[in-house]
């Protein structure tokens, strides 16, 4: 063990610190060492100015903010509240000093003008070349040309086999099939304009009658013939003979009745 630890040293009592002076000494603690809480200050109207101040900011000691050189608070504020943040600058771009809105800048005005022009161009993008009407969608323009445009309605598609005219090209193509008859029966050579008409005709060769009447035992090769037959079972018979007041379910039955010689009831 070193000898210095074994030597007893005597301390001078005159150099003993005065603990009473330390107790009476005022310790100033910076307000920036406390937690950060916004403290609202209600200024008196006769002391403070009308400039609005933001809430006072108090920093915690964990963040270690740099202490300002001047710790003295602003005039009119209590020193225990700490340093007051500077007042926010007023926004002069949107409002003037009187509180009314200022005119829009040239750049914003040009931007609004450009946006309005683009919306106008987009809204009137599709224009009819015949009557100068504008539409926002192409489908609306196409429907206008086909149905509502007077200039387009006068334009027609003529059939090269007869004198019939049609507004649309699709309707003309469907009509031309009645002249060309592209659906031909392989059994008898009879031609039809529609495939379903040919299918119903082929059943006359095969004897197939898939459509049966639910009220009687009759069956038909075509659905349209079944619908006509069902009218005979209906209670409503809207075709009436003018001579004998007899009613029929179909016009063809009324014609047969008139051709056979109507017996007028006396």
Curated annotation (Swiss-Prot):
Residues 1-20 are annotated as: SNAG domain. It comes from the Eukaryota. The keyword Nucleus applies. One of its GO terms (cellular component) is nucleus. Pfam families: zf-C2H2. A zinc finger (C2H2-type) spans 126-148, 157-179, 183-205, 211-233, 239-262. First expressed on the lateral side of stage 12 embryos. At stage 14, strongly expressed in the lateral neural folds. At stage 16, expressed in pre-migratory neural crest cells. At stage 18, expression is dispersed over the neural plate in a pattern surrounding the rhombomeres. At stage 22, expressed in neural crest derivatives, including the branchial arches and the tissues surrounding the eyes and forebrain. After stage 17, expression is weak in the lateral plate mesoderm, increasing at stage 26, but was down-regulated in the pronephros region at stage 26. GO terms for molecular function: DNA-binding transcription factor activity, RNA polymerase II-specific; RNA polymerase II cis-regulatory region sequence-specific DNA binding; zinc ion binding. Residues 75-115 are annotated as: Disordered. The keyword Metal-binding applies. Transmembrane segments: none annotated. Induction: By a combination of noggin and fgf2/bfgf in ectoderm. By wnt signaling. One of its GO terms (biological process) is neural crest cell migration. SMART domains: ZnF_C2H2 (SM00355). Signal peptide: none annotated. SUPFAM superfamilies: beta-beta-alpha zinc fingers. It is found in: Nucleus. Probable transcriptional repressor. Acts downstream of snai1 in the specification of the neural crest and neural crest migration. Interacts (via SNAG domain) with limd1 (via LIM domains), wtip (via LIM domains) and ajuba (via LIM domains). Interacts with elp3. Belongs to the snail C2H2-type zinc-finger protein family. This is Zinc finger protein SNAI2. It comes from Xenopus laevis. The lineage of its organism: Eukaryota, Metazoa, Chordata, Craniata, Vertebrata. The gene is snai2.
């Amino acid at each position: 063990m070193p000898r210095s630890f074994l030597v007893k040293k005597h301390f001078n009592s005159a150099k003993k610190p005065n603990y009473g002076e330390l107790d009476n000494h005022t310790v100033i603690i910076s307000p920036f060492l406390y937690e950060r809480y916004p403290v609202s200050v209600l200024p008196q109207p006769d002391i403070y100015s009308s400039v609005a101040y933001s809430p006072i900011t108090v920093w915690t000691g964990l963040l270690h903010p740099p202490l300002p050189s001047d710790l003295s608070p602003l005039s009119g504020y209590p020193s225990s509240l700490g340093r007051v943040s500077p007042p926010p600058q007023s926004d002069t771009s949107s409002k003037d000093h009187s509180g009314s809105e200022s005119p829009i800048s040239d750049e914003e005005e040009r931007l609004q003008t450009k946006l309005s022009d683009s919306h106008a161009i987009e809204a009137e993008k599709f224009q009819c070349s015949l009557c100068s009407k504008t539409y926002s969608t192409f489908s609306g323009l196409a429907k206008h040309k086909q149905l509502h445009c007077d200039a387009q309605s006068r334009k027609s598609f003529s059939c090269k086999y007869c004198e019939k005219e049609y507004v649309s090209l699709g309707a003309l193509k469907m009509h031309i099939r009645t002249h060309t008859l592209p659906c031909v029966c392989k059994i008898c050579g009879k031609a039809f304009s529609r495939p379903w008409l040919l299918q119903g005709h082929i059943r006359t060769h095969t004897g197939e009658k898939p459509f049966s009447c639910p009220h009687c035992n009759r069956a038909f090769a075509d659905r349209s013939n079944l619908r006509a037959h069902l009218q005979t079972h209906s209670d409503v018979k809207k075709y009436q003979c003018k001579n004998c007041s007899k009613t029929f379910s179909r016009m063809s039955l009324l014609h047969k009745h008139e051709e056979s010689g109507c017996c007028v009831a006396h």
